[in-house]
């Protein structure tokens, strides 16, 4: 396990955002190139030389930078191998991003979807490229000069999520994206079933006790909203000169409609806090707790102020997110 003292977020070298394509993750780029030149909207200039790089830092879907000269686009497809039913839904992500950009500037615009597996080996879609910095455990060099950087990006993220949760899905014809009635109950029951499939005797009773506690205190949603389902700092991008505003949010393939506090609970689950065990790495990136980020209670205050939601029961949502994460890690 990483320990926080192993990483200095303001001195160590950040991971590169682009790399050559990893072994075993190349596509048939000749077929892809021909398809994109023929199928992308006419306003996109595809006359230049074709080139491919990979965004290497994601842990799930495969994400590539495809270029036609100066034109840069992002191609996404599921990972190779067996996939869980409903996971890595490129059609859903395309559906969301082909509409959401119209009312939410932090959503990249999707241009093209293809479910013909002879093109990329699986369903895939293409979207605009956003340029900026993704903050993981190490602060990008282009942002190290900012005062109070951690606090500012925390406030910006809380404001961005609150704005996202205020949107009306009907404004972009996405009101049928999910089934908000009974959403929270289905989340708990669904993750209980997943846990039962991989249950470990050492933790079985504790997980069942947590399930019973969650079910006994099931919250009533305050509004129906978009739910991203994987909101965390490293799914967000900032422009180097502006830590006070999120430039883009990524990984929309699990987006649905439901209780927005499910999203906020997910964020809290990933968020480091000064009171955390120093050997626990929240969010998967050592160094985050040395970045000056707001505490979880401060982040909750910022989000409550912007969203106008009652967060007196926020601990239920955080507990659910932790219980869900335990099930994910056991799989």
Where are these regions (language model features)?
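Active-site activation/catalytic loop segments of kinase-like enzymes and analogous catalytic loops
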Residues: 262-307, 321-331
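Activation of the activation-loop gatekeeper triad in protein kinase-fold domains
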Residues: 250-255
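A generic structural signal for residues located within well-ordered alpha-helices
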Residues: 27, 92, 122, 149, ...
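All-alpha amphipathic helical-bundle segments outside canonical DNA-binding/catalytic cores
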Residues: 178-179, 310-321
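Hydrophobic residue at the +6 position relative to the catalytic HRD Asp in the kinase catalytic loop
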Residues: 236-238
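Catalytic-loop of the protein kinase fold
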Residues: 226-228, 233
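Juxta-kinase regulatory segment immediately upstream of eukaryotic protein kinase catalytic domains
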Residues: 2-45
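ATP-binding pocket architecture of kinase catalytic cores
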Residues: 49-226, 240-244
């Amino acid at each position: 396990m990483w320990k926080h003292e192993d990483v200095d977020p303001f001195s160590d070298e950040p991971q590169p955002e682009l790399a050559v394509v990893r072994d075993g993750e190349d596509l048939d780029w000749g077929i892809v190139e021909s398809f994109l030149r023929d199928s992308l909207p006419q306003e996109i200039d595809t006359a230049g030389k074709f080139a491919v790089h990979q965004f290497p830092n994601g842990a799930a879907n495969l994400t590539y930078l495809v270029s036609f000269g100066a034109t840069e686009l992002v191609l996404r497809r599921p990972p190779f191998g067996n996939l869980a039913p409903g996971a890595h839904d490129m059609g859903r992500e395309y559906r969301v991003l082909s509409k959401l950009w119209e009312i939410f500037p932090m959503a990249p615009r999707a241009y093209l979807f293809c479910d013909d597996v002879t093109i990329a080996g699986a369903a895939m879609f293409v979207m605009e490229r956003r340029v900026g910095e993704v903050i993981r455990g190490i602060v990008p060099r282009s942002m190290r000069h900012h005062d109070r950087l951690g606090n500012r990006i925390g406030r910006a993220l809380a404001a961005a999520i609150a704005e996202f949760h205020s949107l009306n899905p009907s404004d972009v014809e996405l009101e049928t994206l999910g089934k908000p009635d009974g959403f929270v109950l289905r989340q708990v029951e669904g993750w209980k079933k997943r846990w039962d499939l991989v249950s470990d005797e050492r933790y079985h009773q504790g997980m069942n006790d947590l399930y019973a506690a969650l079910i006994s205190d099931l919250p009533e949603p305050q509004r129906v909203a978009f739910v991203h389902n994987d909101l965390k700092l490293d799914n967000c991008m900032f422009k180097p000169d502006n830590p006070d505003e999120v430039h883009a949010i990524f990984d929309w393939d699990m987006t649905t409609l439901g209780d927005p506090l499910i999203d906020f609970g997910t964020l809290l689950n990933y968020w480091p806090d000064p009171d955390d065990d120093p050997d626990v790495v929240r969010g998967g990136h050592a160094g985050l707790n040395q970045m000056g980020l707001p505490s979880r209670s401060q982040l909750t205050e910022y989000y409550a102020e912007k969203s106008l939601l009652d967060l007196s029961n926020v601990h239920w949502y955080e507990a659910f997110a932790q219980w869900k994460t335990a099930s994910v890690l056991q799989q």
